[in-house]
Amino acid sequence: MGDLLLVRHGETEWSRSGRHTGRTDVPLTEHGREEARRLVPLIRSHRIGAAFVSPSQRARETARLIGVRDARVDADLCEWDYGGYEGVTTVDIQRSRPGWFLFTDGVAPGPPDHPGETPEQVGERADRMLAKVDAALAATDGAVVLIAHGHFLRVLTARRLGLPPRHGALFQLATGTLCRLGTEHGRPVIAGWNIRPREV
């Protein structure tokens, strides 16, 4: 069975400033585009059997820039719905909720179009996505690539390893990086994390 490759989109103005960016559709910065372009040799070193991408423009542009042009858009790859914390930094949230932590405390309710998600709800989406990944891996001898978002991919990694969604907190994930999840003796493992070309 092939590897599961995770690509976090390149930098945006909001990711650079630490603002929670769930459903707000912000573009990549020029630095974010360069981060993505520099991943091309790493992507080309793998045989790609299937690819999926979040609907957001930052993820779709990253997919295009890394040379993955036939990725299937899948809403299960959307970033965590931050509800009332959309666009707010952790520092600002903690001014009113000291000790607040996304992976255990969740988010404040938001408007009807993005009401917010609990860690468990994000975990359920990750499980659905992993079922699609496993079906794709069974149908090809290549790797499957997911181009998506930091917090969601951290939860997905935890679920791949059999951990609760809150354990996504253990996996710091930088913009414009590649991660590789594989298997050892039939069990899921992290084979590479936050991989970047040396010149970045």
Task: List the predicted regions and their residue ranges.
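Loop-to-helix element that buttresses phosphate recognition and phosphoryl-transfer chemistry
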Residues: R8-T62, P112-D127
